[in-house]
Curated annotation (Swiss-Prot):
Species the sequence originates in: Methylorubrum extorquens (strain PA1) (Methylobacterium extorquens)
Protein name listed in UniProt: Ribonuclease H
Example GO BP: DNA replication, removal of RNA primer
Class of this enzyme: hydrolase
Binding site for Mg(2+) 1: 11, 49, 71
Classification via InterPro entries: RNase_H, RNaseH-like_sf, RNaseH_domain, RNaseH_sf, RNaseHI
Length: 228
């Protein structure tokens, strides 16, 4: 019989990609669930997925037995299939330097000092820990956009988790908005990636812009331009 492993769900995302993103880890510790999350203004999907796994592993002492559950095949295959070859070639792939090498090397060092079993799980398939990590990563992205400290873990006891329940019904008013064909298509694609309707996606974007106000929107746009 192997060691008793602490189960961890790690998830990250970015919208648009590249753009503002968030990461999260849900640690099912014996003493209770620990939740970590954060975000960055200018990043990518893969960097947020890697960051989620890194922040989760940083929570544990060396030698800890962990089962890391991720819905990112990029993360799982990087560690379990590709990394050994990259290291043998001096952190290079067959076509050039390893992408996100800073995070890959950090992840490699952390995993080497711990007993980690890597498990891929299908995203948005109803697995509670994965769904929770996904919602927290979304919250991390929103907080990064609102100017809160990004990239720092914020542990939460299970009974003090941030409220992420669906919004209560409110009175609505229909407003017609004319969009260019390109913008309408981009909106539809982004909503599809987020798993929501274009109307809900647009409403969320409008609310966020109203919260940020013009100076905040300008700051986010400048960060994205620097990252591009």
């Amino acid at each position: 019989m192997g060691p008793m492993r602490t189960i961890v769900y790690a998830d990250g995302g970015c919208d648009p990609n590249p753009g503002p993103g968030g990461w999260a880890a849900v640690i099912q510790a014996p003493t209770g669930t620990i939740e970590l999350y954060g975000g960055e203004l200018a990043t990518t999907n893969n960097r947020m997925e890697l960051t989620a796994a890194i922040r989760a592993l940083e929570h544990f002492p060396e030698g800890a037995a962990i089962e890391m559950r991720c819905d990112s095949q990029y993360v799982v295959k990087s560690v379990t299939e590709w990394m050994r070859g990259w290291k043998a070639r001096g952190w290079r792939t067959a076509t050039g330097p390893v992408k996100n090498i800073d995070l890959m090397q950090r992840l490699d060092a952390l995993a080497a000092a711990r007993d980690v079993r890597w498990t891929w799980v299908r995203g948005h398939a109803g697995e509670a820990g994965n769904e929770r990590a996904d919602r927290l990563a979304t919250l991390g992205r929103r907080e990064a956009l609102s100017g809160k400290t990004s990239g720092e873990a914020m542990p939460l006891p299970a009974d003090a988790a941030p409220a992420l329940a669906p919004a209560q019904p409110v009175q609505s008013k229909t407003v017609q908005v004319a969009l260019s064909a390109d913008l309408a298509n981009a909106l539809s694609r982004a909503a599809g990636r987020a798993g929501i309707t274009p109307q809900a996606y647009l409403e969320d974007a409008v609310r966020l812009a109203l919260e940020l106000k013009p100076p905040g929107v300008a700051r986010v746009r400048a960060e994205l331009q620097k990252a591009s």
